[in-house]
């Protein structure tokens, strides 16, 4: 399994709404389909680190690339949902962004989810159900008993921790991210979305 790659951009192009990079790593060039946010932030011959997912297909293999570990793990969660393929998953991440997408799934905001190309009402409902189930499992593992309230202030950090751990981050990484956000003066009464945004940004910088 190829978890991440670091190299130089040898080529970059678009085919319709699909974004592609050719990443030169030593004597090997890897062709990746990438999220739009990653593609727009690259330039030819620039050094780039890409978090990757290798997909097995009937006609071969396909590498998908992402700017952050969180985006990559979110992509894996999305494609595990019935009816959501790689293109729909990329469209959700590129169109909404990780934080807004997580917020929409947690809040069961079907209208927002349906803004992404290829996502209808039934798919949006399945996405919300799958994410809530995954998040509830993490929440219960941490001793939570009350319903999750992702749109509420972060007076209790267990909900935030459950969200970050569901994206694949370990307990120590999560603790460091939450502590860092607090040390930067983020108000405990700020909505969950703001804390999540700060934590994901910090975790992304550490991975880079």
Swiss-Prot record:
Region feature Flexible linker, mapped onto this chain: 147-157
Signal peptide: none
Annotated GO biological process: DNA recombination; DNA repair
Renumbered residue ranges of the record's region Domain I: 1-67
Listed InterPro entries: DNA_helicase_Holl-junc_RuvA_I (IPR013849), NA-bd_OB-fold (IPR012340), RuvA (IPR000085), RuvA_2-like (IPR010994), RuvA_C (IPR011114), RuvA_C_sf (IPR036267)
Keyword annotations: Cytoplasm, DNA damage, DNA recombination, DNA repair, DNA-binding
GO molecular function: ATP binding; four-way junction DNA binding; four-way junction helicase activity
Annotated spans, Domain III: 157-208
Chief location category: cytoplasm
Pfam families from the UniProt entry: HHH_5, RuvA_C, RuvA_N
Region (Domain II): 68-146
Top-rank taxon, per record: Bacteria
GO cellular component: cytoplasm; Holliday junction helicase complex; Holliday junction resolvase complex
Compartments reported by the entry: Cytoplasm
Comment field on protein domains: Has three domains with a flexible linker between the domains II and III and assumes an 'L' shape. Domain III is highly mobile and contacts RuvB.
Role this protein plays: The RuvA-RuvB-RuvC complex processes Holliday junction (HJ) DNA during genetic recombination and DNA repair, while the RuvA-RuvB complex plays an important role in the rescue of blocked DNA replication forks via replication fork reversal (RFR). RuvA specifically binds to HJ cruciform DNA, conferring on it an open structure. The RuvB hexamer acts as an ATP-dependent pump, pulling dsDNA into and through the RuvAB complex. HJ branch migration allows RuvC to scan DNA until it finds its consensus sequence, where it cleaves and resolves the cruciform DNA.
Subunit-structure text: Homotetramer. Forms an RuvA(8)-RuvB(12)-Holliday junction (HJ) complex. HJ DNA is sandwiched between 2 RuvA tetramers; dsDNA enters through RuvA and exits via RuvB. An RuvB hexamer assembles on each DNA strand where it exits the tetramer. Each RuvB hexamer is contacted by two RuvA subunits (via domain III) on 2 adjacent RuvB subunits; this complex drives branch migration. In the full resolvosome a probable DNA-RuvA(4)-RuvB(12)-RuvC(2) complex forms which resolves the HJ.
Family classification: Belongs to the RuvA family.
Protein name as catalogued: Holliday junction branch migration complex subunit RuvA
Gene giving rise to this polypeptide: ruvA
């Amino acid at each position: 399994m190829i978890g991440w790659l670091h190299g130089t951009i040898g080529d970059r192009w678009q085919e319709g709404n699909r974004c592609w990079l050719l990443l030169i790593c030593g004597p090997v060039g890897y062709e990746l389909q990438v999220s739009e946010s990653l593609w727009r932030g690259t330039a030819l011959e620039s050094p780039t680190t890409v978090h990757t997912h290798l997909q097995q297909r009937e006609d071969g293999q396909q590498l998908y690339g992402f700017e952050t570990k969180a985006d990559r793990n979110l992509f894996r969660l999305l494609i595990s949902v019935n009816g959501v393929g790689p293109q729909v998953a990329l469209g959700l991440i590129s169109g909404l962004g990780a934080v807004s997408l997580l917020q929409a799934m947690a809040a069961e905001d079907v209208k927002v989810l349906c803004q992404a190309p290829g996502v209808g009402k039934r798919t949006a409902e399945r996405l919300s159900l799958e994410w809530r189930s995954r998040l509830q499992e993490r929440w219960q593992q941490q001793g939570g008993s009350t319903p999750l309230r992702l749109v509420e202030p972060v007076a209790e950090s267990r909900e935030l921790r459950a969200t970050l751990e569901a994206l694949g981050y370990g307990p120590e990484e999560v603790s460091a991210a939450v502590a860092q956000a607090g040390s930067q003066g983020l108000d405990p009464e700020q909505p969950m979305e703001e804390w999540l945004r700060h934590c994901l940004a910090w975790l992304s910088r550490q991975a880079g």
